[in-house]
Amino acid sequence: MLPRMAEFPTNPARFDPYKNFNFRVKWDGQYVPAITRVSGLLRTTGVVENREGGDLSTSRKSAGLTQFAPIILERGLTDDPAFENWTNLVWQFGAGSESSLNEFRKNIYVELYNEAGQLVRAYKVFRCWPSEYQPLSQLDANIAAVLVESLTLQNEGWERDTSVVPPAQT
């Protein structure tokens, strides 16, 4: 049997991809408790096609507008009011519109950890604001399940934090 070659040249002692269950999210410098799912870290660049009048057979393609999908955060319902408090900055019953134009946009930080609990990758998501908030998942007396709270965040882009470098595997 041949010895197994390292699959990841930047960290040769690592053989397996990172798992999807070891992560944390923070905003305002605080980790948000109980988040169980993060989805929507997606960037799409549109295609602009054009054709020259003398070219009969092909069109040219160039990059168009780039859009960033909403980020969806889900967590088991707890007594922590972070989702609700942020949503109330955007719109609060009785106030009629934005309650705080200064504070309703926030940058969030999504951190990924390896099996040893070491930070290996992070993403900065810019100028997020809640566009949808679901304080309770479906209530059903016939099912034993955890209640889920959901927050959909619009954003103006994200980037990988390149200052986060995976530690050497030993």
Predicted regions and their residues:
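Glycine-rich, low-complexity intrinsically disordered segments
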Residues: 2-170
